Amino acid sequence: MHRSKPKNSEGGIIDSHDEEISDLSLRWHKPLSKNNVQMPALKILRYKKIRSNYSKLENILMIGFETTKYPRYFLVLPISGQTLYQENYIKMFYKNLNTNLKKYFLFKHYPKSVMSNGFNIDDRIRSLLPDKQLISNYKKAIKKAKVVICNYPSTTFLEAMISGPTILLYKPEFWKFTSDFDNLINKLKRANILFDNPAAAAKHLNKVWDNVNIWWESKEVQSVRNQFFSEACDSREKYLDIWKNFLISQENEYFQKKRDKEA
């Protein structure tokens, strides 16, 4: 029996390889097939309290992504030069920020140690930002971010969402989700968490900046956040018990089948 490892599948981005080869496929998101099992996202939960004091923080942290210059895989995300749209998105977002907020803007580029042959998005915006606003230490920066702007719907977006005020700024045609998440995506848009227009995202941030908590803690946004963590990233409190009970049940099932064969 094959059990694939837990995956976020970028919150439901189309990917059925594990389901096709596995008896069970462990996922952070809600089950999308009969062999899916939703399990708590241990990697994400450790970020839950790192921005609990977000209203007292002052930075705007934008997090970018990279892809290789030449395609290596068939993926449902930006491939090769498609990633360059980010440059325009970053510049447009920054241009539409209120002048008094621009000094708080930081850009976290994708680690070159991981993607050494990418398009170096950070180098492409050096004319826009001084070096002190181009940062490399993600964990240090997110702890000081009042709002995080994530340019891609992957693990980093989940970490930002669970920790405090977050905006996802992405290009829908390059990030394909299953229709199972249409309702959630529409609600994220209405709650001003998800944007595909950089200028609109910046204008929203300008509007809520002085009282971010009024937006983030509003009834509508809290409802959408709860739905998000129910459907896209399991964040149940008793995560260790859930994992323990699941593993014990699988072990018991394995040995029971073994005993049945030997009987």
Name each model-derived stretch.
Residues 6-9, 32-36, 70-71, 113-122, ...:
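Short, charged/polar "capping" segments at the starts of alpha-helices
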Residues 18, 140-142, 187:
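Structural alpha-helical scaffold elements that stabilize or flank donor/cofactor-binding regions
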Residues 37-38, 55, 123-126, 146-147, ...:
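Catalytic binding pocket for nucleotide-activated donors in carbohydrate/polymer assembly enzymes
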Residues 42-127:
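Conserved catalytic-core segment of nucleotide-activated headgroup transferases in glycan assembly
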Residues 127-136:
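Active-site donor-binding acidic/aromatic loop of nucleotide-activated sugar
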Residues 230-263:
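C-terminal alpha-helical cap of glycosyltransferases
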